[in-house]
Amino acid sequence: MQNTTSALSKVPAVTAAFWLTKIAATTLGETGGDAVTMSMDLGYLTGTLIFAAIFLAAVIVQIRHHSFNKWIYWFTVVATTTVGTTLADFADRSLGIGYLGGTVLLSSLLVLSLLVWRVTCGTIAVDSVNSVRTESFYWVTIMFSQTLGTALGDWTADSEGFGYDGGILLFVGALAVIWLASRFTSISRTVLFWAAFILTRPLGAVVGDFLDKPIAKGGLELSRYGARFFSAARCGKTHRQTRIIPTSVA
């Protein structure tokens, strides 16, 4: 899903490297969030407050930077995944609404964010992300999509019985369908972009759980710090292949 160049947009080129880095970043955020809330035993609320502060600081730096910078951009993406992980776990477990309840709630918030963005700015295409207003909507929407992805990944892998390997296959298959739609249909590329962006999050979440969950539950039982190191290394490798020139997906 890559198209024409837009020098004004503050998002990276939507290439294969973009999607690989996105998945690696979401896996890093999943394991990082779990490391703080579980391994360090700080709890979901404290973890959410910590990562929310980091997320807000990263967004401020990203918005105040007047041109696209891949280091700032991908750090902000990782920040959205960590706060998304802890926020989803807080909603699902601490508030007791469960994976399905969390998925429904977060889906509603995501749709509302996209609708308000569309009504306010006239478009949700990423090549329009070139002002404080559009960037603010962009990062709020991404944060909701990352949070939804955590709940959706946990719901399919745990509650629905797919397991981690089954969840990985499910979301890879869904992304393959989106790719085919981008190649052989006239469906809006903006719609397909956001669909793919949303679904890469539960894929990253399931991969993260697969790395650090016990073998008895279908995981590899890596330590959360080891899984985070693995994810960071993978994210850094694909990040270097990310093109600096932004691109339109509309």
Regions found by a protein language model. Name each.
Residues M1-A250:
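Polytopic alpha-helical membrane proteins, predominantly small-molecule transporters/carriers
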